[in-house]
Amino acid sequence: MRRRLLYIASIVLLLVACESYDCTLYNHVGCYGAFYQDSASVSLDDTLTITAGKSGPVLLNKSVGTSKIDLSLSYWQDEDTLVLTVKGTDYLVQDTIWISKSNQVHYESPDCPATLFHTIQGVRSTHEFIDSINVIRSSVNYEQTNNLQIHLFSAAD
């Protein structure tokens, strides 16, 4: 009887100790950025659209009041091209951002598909409305923290 109780208790403890990992909740790899002007965080008053390249898919469509962005990076390319289009009532301006990166395969568990983490190696832009871009965190993974500080030209420029 004692042996049977020990066996049942060990089975119960084993079942309780198992962790259920839901892959769909925790597997978004995103490159996060925030807009700054004159060293202060700002929101864009006008409409922002972001596409992957000139004729690529739309990553962000007609967003208004945008202060932060979540960019999906490509899986195997060493450099991604993103076109940011800002449209106001009487103007339209585009700036292109190139993000050079390395890609690392990341394996979480047998139940989850492999994902790719990235390491940002450099960022440049065409400087149409973006003054500069600082990489504040080069590692792009599951953590939802800012990777890029996108500095816009000051209002006086």
Predicted regions and their residues:
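Bacterial Sec-dependent N-terminal signal peptides
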Residues: 15-36
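Extracytoplasmic cysteine-anchoring/structural motifs
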Residues: 18-25, 72-157
